[in-house]
């Protein structure tokens, strides 16, 4: 009847309380953006932050990268005290830098130092995209240049892992100058027969991809890494064509001759050790080739 419409009890849906939503502590579980599988974060970390289901490579910070590659207690960091200023007086730039320092416990977007990989010495630079998206400013360029000069001085190989959104806009032309400075340092190092190994990780874009990231004697990348200078949309608008779906991926660049290899993270240490062995001893340690 008509009156029943107004007298009938309403049905309500129960909404979880805020407390119930947070019963699982933040960071305990991680969802893979590729296959959507949910896994324990600690298990993901044990697997070098590679999805156990589909092989997707999650980003690594500098500390995780060092622990996965270098021999235990072999890493000696240098120039860690260098910090960015605000030469152009860009609004709120220093405040953003300070927030990233607190969040990451880093002073800048690259960590440099010397260590050993399976006993073979090298100077290594590792960019960290958790700090200002790994953008390249004056300090990043200077630290990388000093690391290259250190490798030249000690006559050991130079290895760099890149992860960057490109030049840091808050430093304007000073950030663009780092492209030339780092490239010049690599040129001088190469003239002294120094070995340069570049490993591009997701993402490596902008001025970083157009300078030191692409200047290795060996240019490698992790699977699925985005590598490029300009964005996909800008390129499509400029050339008036639709680009392939896998355009600007590590696999696409390998197929077109712009990379020497795409290396799974679980194999990275052994592959690097093999190259260091080959260039430093002539390949005495045959076990590395197995």
Swiss-Prot record:
Cell division in keyword set: no
Location within or outside the cell: Cytoplasm
Pfam hit, one: Carboxyl_trans
Binding site for Zn(2+): 32, 35, 51, 54
Catalytic activity: N(6)-carboxybiotinyl-L-lysyl-[protein] + acetyl-CoA = N(6)-biotinyl-L-lysyl-[protein] + malonyl-CoA
Keywords: ATP-binding, Cytoplasm, Fatty acid biosynthesis, Fatty acid metabolism, Lipid biosynthesis, Lipid metabolism, Metal-binding, Nucleotide-binding, Transferase, Zinc, Zinc-finger
Entry's Gene Ontology cellular component terms: acetyl-CoA carboxylase complex
Cofactor(s) listed: Zn(2+)
Entries under InterPro entries matching the protein: AcCoA_carboxyl_beta, Acetyl_CoA_COase_Trfase_b_su, ClpP/crotonase-like_dom_sf, COA_CT_N, Znf-ACC
One annotated GO biological process: malonyl-CoA biosynthetic process
Pathway entry: Lipid metabolism; malonyl-CoA biosynthesis; malonyl-CoA from acetyl-CoA: step 1/1
Molecular-function GO term, any one: acetyl-CoA carboxylase activity
Transmembrane regions: none
Broad class of where this protein is predominantly found: cytoplasm
Keyword Lipid biosynthesis (UniProt): yes
EC number: 2.1.3.15
ZnF segments: C4-type: 32-54
Main enzyme class: transferase
Bound cofactor: record note: Binds 1 zinc ion per subunit.
Superkingdom per UniProt: Bacteria
Domain CoA carboxyltransferase N-terminal as annotated: residue spans: 28-290
Family: Belongs to the AccD/PCCB family.
Subunit composition and interactions: Acetyl-CoA carboxylase is a heterohexamer composed of biotin carboxyl carrier protein (AccB), biotin carboxylase (AccC) and two subunits each of ACCase subunit alpha (AccA) and ACCase subunit beta (AccD).
Annotated function: Component of the acetyl coenzyme A carboxylase (ACC) complex. Biotin carboxylase (BC) catalyzes the carboxylation of biotin on its carrier protein (BCCP) and then the CO(2) group is transferred by the transcarboxylase to acetyl-CoA to form malonyl-CoA.
Protein name: Acetyl-coenzyme A carboxylase carboxyl transferase subunit beta
